[in-house]
UniProtKB/Swiss-Prot annotation:
Keyword Transcription listed: no
Protein name as it appears in the record: RNA-directed RNA polymerase beta chain
Keyword DNA damage listed: no
Gene Ontology terms, MF aspect: nucleotide binding; RNA-directed RNA polymerase activity
EC main group: transferase
One Pfam entry name: RNA_replicase_B
Protein's organism: Enterobacteria phage fr
Length: 545
């Protein structure tokens, strides 16, 4: 056995302790200024310090898992109650507002009506299943081909549409003849509430939809997504909003607006008021009217929750229409950007947009809304005076090499200016990097967790012409940790038929992979490209290699 093989076989993936607090303390020791983006004393490193552990499950000023879950559900139910009040009493207009709600609503209806014209022939074209958990399938069994192959769930109101769309797919019909149990649908009362981690104080609530409801909802979502692109709102590209946020932080021309529980604040009355009647009726038919919360069924006053297949596109369209109608009303022609509930509009009309949003039942999050100053935030991008100050987060304990290498790369990639990493973070990077085997250094991808990005080891190209090595086409050389994935190669006849139906919908190879706990060391070779360098590394014999 070679020395190299022995070295790899003896590699210990796990660390002896969680290093998260050590990273935090090192950053806190060099942080100065205020972490409040609204403050004149704001500094990026103080912002990083206070954000670093906000998503860690055990550290920081957080709550336990049960409390986070209960707070998330309580927040969802509170939003549902607000929607119920709007459904009963209507929208509450502030008499001091500088616009007429009837005029604004007429403009909004016109914008949405024109955007969605000809919808009746488009809604079934892009229906498909997601790979998420549903009321009929747990997450580990939620591959789309399994939903096609097995008996699907549906609400009573959506049953007619589900039968109609299934009968238009010939592979699905043939499958049902061979496997009769998949021909009929299983009726369920509604969706089911679950929570996912958001930060260490509160979880995020969402819902698992019945299978066929989700299938139909995604058809609507895909249609709205394509139509929004015709007016400059591309829901497949977050970088548009990110660039606009950078522009706003640089010259103050654009404001970024954040809403609290945005999608859960879309009331039934709001959708009824904005959408064409026939389209509203169809969306109302395929949504879940009831939900299971902690084993009890409740009625949804909000129109759709996160987890519904059209919620993201519907809220994007609604916010686009509100902002655009406000622009028209006040004769503003500036740039707008919408990505879900990430709203960007010209600074001069931002107060009017906030008024309109509040009128329709939305709650602006003023802590994360920026209409003045030099800070802007949108779609995960954070800019101060045009410079990227996005913090990184420790979302789980740093207890193995993968999590350690990821945080080392985050440290190197934070606060980079002209290719130079922040020198204040070098000490913690250098100290923790000693725990990683040296053959895992030399990578170039700062988003990776399978090697450490560092000034690369060069591999020269031998030239037969002059008999020496040249570095004109240098590549990095080293190793990386690779997770072992096992691919399912054999499928039952039923699931193989489901794979064909899934292929008929989306094309491409339909596979099913499972991750195992095993890892192995693999050689890596990447084209040399610039990586951020700490000033302390810019001297003779200073490279960690």
């Amino acid at each position: 056995m070679s020395k190299s093989t022995k070295k790899f076989n003896s590699l210990c993936i796990d660390l002896s302790r969680d290093l998260s607090l050590e990273v935090y303390q090192s950053i806190a020791s060099v942080a100065t200024g205020s972490s409040d983006p609204h403050s004149d004393d704001f500094t990026a490193i103080a912002y990083l310090r206070d954000e670093l552990l906000t998503k860690h499950p055990n550290l920081g000023d957080g709550n336990d898992e049960a409390t986070r879950r209960s707070l998330a559900i309580a927040k969802l139910l509170e939003a549902n109650d607000r929607c119920g009040q709007i459904n009963r009493d209507g929208f509450l207009h502030d008499a001091t507002a500088s616009w007429d709600p009837d005029v604004l609503q007429t403009s909004i209806r016109s914008l949405i009506g024109n955007l969605l014209s000809g919808y009746s022939s488009q809604l079934f074209r892009h229906c498909t299943f997601s790979n998420g958990a549903s009321m009929g399938h747990k997450l580990q069994d939620a591959a789309p081909y399994k939903k096609f192959a097995e008996q699907a769930t549906v609400t009573p109101r959506a049953l007619k549409a589900a039968v109609l769309v299934k009968d238009q797919c010939s592979p699905w019909i043939r499958h049902s003849h061979v496997f009769p149990e998949s021909y009929t649908f299983r009726l369920v009362g509604g969706n089911g509430v679950f929570t996912v981690p958001k930060n260490n104080k509160i979880d995020r609530a969402a819902c698992k939809e019945p299978d066929m409801n989700m299938y139909l909802q995604k058809g609507v979502g895909g249609f709205i997504r394509r139509r929004l692109k015709t007016v400059g709102i591309d829901l497949n590209d977050q970088t548009i909003n990110q660039r606009l946020a950078q522009q706003g932080s640089r010259d103050g021309s654009l404001a970024t607006i954040d809403l609290s529980s945005a999608s859960d604040s879309i009331s039934d009355r709001l959708v009824w008021s904005f959408l064409p009647p026939e389209l509203y009726s169809y969306l109302d038919m395929i949504r879940s009217h009831y939900g299971y919360v902690n084993g009890k069924m409740i009625r949804w006053e909000l129109f759709s929750t996160m987890g519904n297949g059209f919620t993201f596109e519907l809220e994007s369209m609604i916010f686009w229409a509100i902002v655009r109608a406000t622009q028209i009303h006040f004769r503003n022609t500036g740039t707008i950007g919408i990505y879900g509930d990430d709203i960007i509009c010209p600074t001069e009309i931002a107060p009017r947009v906030l008024e309109a949003l509040s009128f329709y039942g939305f709650k602006p999050n003023l802590r994360k809304t920026f209409t003045s100053g030099s800070f802007r935030e949108s779609c995960g991008a954070h800019y101060f005076r045009g410079v990227d100050v996005k913090p990184f987060y420790i979302k789980k304990p740093i207890t193995d090499l993968f999590s350690l290498m990821l945080i080392l790369n985050r440290i190197r990639g934070w606060g980079v200016v002209n290719g130079i990493a922040d020198p204040r973070l070098y000490e913690v990077w250098e100290k923790l990097s000693r725990l990683v085997p040296r053959y895992l250094f030399g990578g170039t991808d700062l988003q990776a967790d399978y090697y450490v990005v560092s000034p690369p080891i060069l591999k020269g190209i031998y030239s037969k012409m002059n008999g020496r090595r040249e570095y004109a086409e240098a590549r990095t050389t080293g190793f990386k940790l690779a997770r072992i994935a096992r691919w399912r190669k054999h499928f039952s006849d039923k699931h193989d038929s489901g794979r064909y139906i899934a292929w008929f919908h989306t094309g491409g190879e339909i596979t099913d992979s499972m991750k195992s706990a095993g890892v192995r060391v693999m050689r890596t070779s990447e084209w040399l490209q610039p990586v951020p360098v700490f000033p302390q590394e810019c001297g003779p014999a200073s490279s960690p290699q």
